[in-house]
C-alpha cells in the first residue's frame, strides 16, 4: 500500500510517500517557514538529491497544497494518507480514520497543543477536500500512553480543576515508543517483557512498556515535562514559574518561551541545542558543555530509575532518535549508572552502533539486553493507515 505520511509542525511540514510492504520511500520533502512571507520547499524522489525553491507558505493549507501539486507530477499513486497528530487528548487510545466526528475531537483538544493541532487539522481538511475518495488516518503521539494506570497519569491537583480543564499526564513520542516495542519484540521475542524505551533527541522522553502496554512515560500534560532536552528545561519546581513572574516581572508568554525555546542543552552549554556541537566543545574542555552533557545523562538516568520501578524491573533498554542513535558516549554514561542492575555494555559494539540499523550493544552476560534501534515514525504511521483501512 502506498501511503503519504504528513507530519505538520508549528511552522513546518514534512512528508514521505512510502510502500508499506517494501518500506521503499518513493518521495519525501519538507515545507519550512510556514506563516512567514517566504518559505522553502524541498522535494526528492527515489533517494535522489533534494531540489529546493522559495515558495510563499502563508498557512498549512498552502504548504500541503504545494506537496500534493508536486506529487501529482509523478507517476506515484497514493492509496491513503496518514497524519501525525501531536495531541489526541482524552478522546483517542488508538489511531483513527478521519471523519467529521474525529476532526471535531482533534479541534476540541487543540488548546492542549495549540501550536500543532490547528495546523495538522488544516492539512487534514485540505487532503479530504482534494482527494475525498482517499482514506485519511490520524495517528496520535498520545494514544499509546492512554494505557497508563490512573495512579501514573493523575496530577495531585483539585479534581474539579483537572476534570474541567482535562489536566493529566498525556505523554508524547508515542508513535516512536510503539515502534521501538514492535521492533524489539520482533528481534528478541519472549526475552522482551519489560522494556525501557529511550527516545533521546532534541525532544526527549522515556517510556516504560510492559508486554506492549505503556505503564508510564516522562512527558506530561505537554512535551515540556520530563527530561532535559535541546531547548526545553524538562521537570523543574512548578513554583519557578510563579517566582519568575512575581520577582522578575516576566509575562506568562515570556516564561513559556524561556522554558520551551531557551532552556535545556542550549541554556546550560551557552552555545547550542545540538548535542554534536556540545560534545565537540566538551571534548576540548569547555566546562559549560561538560556540564550540559553530564546533566543530560544524569536527568535521563534519574528518570529512567522511576520508569524501571514502575515495571518492577527491566529486561530490555532501547536507545533511539538523534542522540540515542548516534551518541555512544551518552549511551555509555547512561548504562554505567545501571551497573547495579546488571547492565553491561560492550564498549566496541556501542561505539560501532551508529547508523547501522538495529544492533545489540550489551555485553555477554549482561542481565539486561541493551539495543540501538533507529526509529521510523513514518513507517509506523503508514502501518496504521494500512491496518485501519485495508478491510474497508
For each predicted feature, which ranges?
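Short beta-strand-loop/turn "lid" adjacent to the catalytic site in phosphate-handling enzymes
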Residues: 71-116, 137, 143-152
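General beta-strand structural signal in soluble alpha/beta enzymes
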Residues: 83, 114-118, 135-140, 146, ...
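Catalytic phosphate/nucleotide-handling subdomain of diverse soluble enzymes
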Residues: 210, 216-251, 257, 321-353
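Internal helix-turn-beta structural module
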Residues: 290, 294-315, 324-392
Amino acid at each position: 500500500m502506498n501511503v503519504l505520511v504528513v507530519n505538520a509542525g508549528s511552522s513546518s511540514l514534512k512528508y514521505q510517500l512510502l510502500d508499506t510492504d517494501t518500506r521503499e520511500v518513493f518521495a519525501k520533502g519538507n515545507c519550512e517557514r510556514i506563516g512567514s512571507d517566504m518559505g522553502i520547499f524541498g522535494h526528492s524522489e527515489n533517494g535522489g538529491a533534494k531540489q529546493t525553491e522559495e515558495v510563499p507558505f502563508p498557512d498549512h493549507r498552502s504548504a500541503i497544497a504545494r506537496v500534493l501539486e508536486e506529487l501529482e507530477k509523478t507517476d506515484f499513486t497514493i492509496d491513503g494518507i496518514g497524519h501525525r497528530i501531536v495531541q489526541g487528548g482524552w478522546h483517542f487510545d488508538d489511531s483513527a480514520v478521519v471523519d467529521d466526528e474525529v476532526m471535531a475531537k482533534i479541534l476540541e483538544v487543540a488548546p492542549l497543543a495549540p501550536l500543532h493541532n490547528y495546523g495538522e487539522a488544516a492539512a487534514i481538511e485540505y487532503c479530504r477536500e482534494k482527494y475525498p475518495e482517499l482514506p485519511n488516518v490520524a495517528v496520535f503521539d498520545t494514544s499509546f500512553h492512554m494505557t497508563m494506570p490512573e495512579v501514573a497519569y493523575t496530577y495531585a491537583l483539585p479534581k474539579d480543576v483537572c476534570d474541567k480543564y482535562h489536566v493529566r499526564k498525556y505523554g508524547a513520542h508515542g508513535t516512536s515508543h510503539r515502534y521501538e516495542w514492535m521492533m524489539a519484540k520482533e528481534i528478541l521475542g519472549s526475552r522482551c517483557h519489560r522494556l525501557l524505551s529511550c527516545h533521546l533527541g532534541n525532544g526527549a522522553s522515556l517510556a516504560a512498556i510492559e508486554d506492549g502496554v505503556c505503564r508510564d512515560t516522562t512527558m506530561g500534560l505537554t512535551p515540556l515535562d520530563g527530561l532535559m532536552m535541546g531547548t526545553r528545561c524538562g521537570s523543574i519546581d512548578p513554583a519557578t514559574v510563579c517566582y519568575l513572574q512575581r520577582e522578575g516581572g516576566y509575562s506568562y508568554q515570556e516564561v513559556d518561551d524561556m522554558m520551551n525555546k531557551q532552556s535545556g542543552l542550549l541554556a546550560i552549554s551557552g552555545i547550542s541545542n545540538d548535542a554534536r556541537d556540545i560534545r565537540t566543545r566538551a571534548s576540548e574542555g569547555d566546562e559549560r558543555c561538560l556540564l550540559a552533557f553530564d546533566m543530560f545523562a544524569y536527568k535521563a538516568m534519574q528518570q529512567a530509575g522511576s520508569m524501571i520501578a514502575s515495571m518492577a524491573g527491566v529486561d530490555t533498554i532501547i536507545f533511539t532518535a538523534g542522540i540515542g542513535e548516534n551518541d555512544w558516549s551518552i549511551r555509555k554514561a547512561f548504562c554505567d549508572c545501571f551497573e547495579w542492575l546488571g547492565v553491561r555494555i560492550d564498549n566496541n559494539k556501542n561505539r560501532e552502533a551508529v547508523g547501522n540499523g538495529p544492533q545489540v550493544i550489551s555485553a555477554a552476560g549482561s542481565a539486561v539486553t541493551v539495543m540501538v534501534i533507529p526509529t521510523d515514525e513514518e513507517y509506523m504511521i503508514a502501518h496504521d493507515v494500512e491496518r485501519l483501512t485495508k478491510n474497508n
